[in-house]
């Protein structure tokens, strides 16, 4: 049995972000502005259900407590419910989450919960339907809002909403978002726009620091909360007058990487030690058969020896991440 995943800087890893597809049906300006472009290779190139079962088991036995399914849009997988159920076979995984654009939420969220999904993040970059359409390329604002309501109706106590913070788009809309979460158990997370290989011009035009939002929150009496060991990187704030919470994810902030607790596996089976790192470590040759489980765990744990102390975003180096659908953000 390999001990808890730990790197050379004594960081422990409890959280796996597992991409199950690169495909997305939205065309968000900061991610896939031209829509998903198939690369013409094998349509079965994404991890199969059995491969997902094996990789999740390996991580569970290495101390992983939380798995987040990402994409692309994970719910476009026809076997998405089966994937949820397969990962929930691991009792060590206490939290199983998905990040979704909300397109299929209203229709399917009850099935996801029944299969074992425990947490939900929905991407909503604007509360104005026309602006939502302009950002995503899809006139689906009402459908996504109905999906969030459906999540509450089927038993989710809280929903997280991801909002990419952009100058001249939504950075001046804090009060609108605060009004929305005042009586809703939503954790609204502002995520700083990150530079990717394909998004340099957009980054220069729209990047704004989350510090702007933090100062406004502190001035209005919001209090920062402690983070659990398997939580993501958000700084979370609460206020006694609000049912909802605000999260801030600021990857350009000093020491952002000090508390890194997460690893990534891409939809084609490569282990990525950082969202903005270089080429991943291939795992797929060890996912074909249950007999390779111990070798798989050794490759995962051994790979951590090469994890860098920090990303290099401040230097304009986004590694191999051409867009955020590639590894799953």
Curated annotation (Swiss-Prot):
Catalysed reaction, written as an equation: GTP + AH2 + S-adenosyl-L-methionine = (8S)-3',8-cyclo-7,8-dihydroguanosine 5'-triphosphate + 5'-deoxyadenosine + L-methionine + A + H(+)
Domain of life: Bacteria
GO MF term (any one): 4 iron, 4 sulfur cluster binding
CDD domains the record matches: Radical_SAM, Twitch_MoaA
Cofactor binding note from Swiss-Prot or TrEMBL: Binds 2 [4Fe-4S] clusters. Binds 1 [4Fe-4S] cluster coordinated with 3 cysteines and an exchangeable S-adenosyl-L-methionine and 1 [4Fe-4S] cluster coordinated with 3 cysteines and the GTP-derived substrate.
Gene3D superfamilies linked: Aldolase class I
UniProt-listed InterPro entries: Aldolase_TIM, Elp3/MiaA/NifB-like_rSAM, MoaA, MoaA_NifB_PqqE_Fe-S-bd_CS, MoaA_twitch, MoCo_biosynth_MoaA/MoaC, rSAM
Keyword GTP-binding: yes
Keywords from the UniProt entry: 4Fe-4S, GTP-binding, Iron, Iron-sulfur, Lyase, Metal-binding, Molybdenum cofactor biosynthesis, Nucleotide-binding, S-adenosyl-L-methionine
The enzyme's E.C. designation: 4.1.99.22
Cofactor(s) recorded in Swiss-Prot or TrEMBL: [4Fe-4S] cluster
Residues that bind [4Fe-4S] cluster 2: 257, 260, 274
One annotated GO biological process: Mo-molybdopterin cofactor biosynthetic process
Radical SAM core domain segment(s): 8-234
Binding site for [4Fe-4S] cluster 1: 24, 28, 31
Transmembrane among keywords: no
Pathway stated in the Swiss-Prot or TrEMBL entry: Cofactor biosynthesis; molybdopterin biosynthesis
Annotated positions binding GTP: 17, 68, 99, 160, 262-264
Any Pfam family hit: Radical_SAM
Binding site for S-adenosyl-L-methionine: 30, 72, 123, 194
UniProt function note: Catalyzes the cyclization of GTP to (8S)-3',8-cyclo-7,8-dihydroguanosine 5'-triphosphate.
UniProt similarity note: Belongs to the radical SAM superfamily. MoaA family.
Subunit relationships: Monomer and homodimer.
Record's protein name: GTP 3',8-cyclase
Organism encoding this protein: Pectobacterium atrosepticum (strain SCRI 1043 / ATCC BAA-672) (Erwinia carotovora subsp. atroseptica)
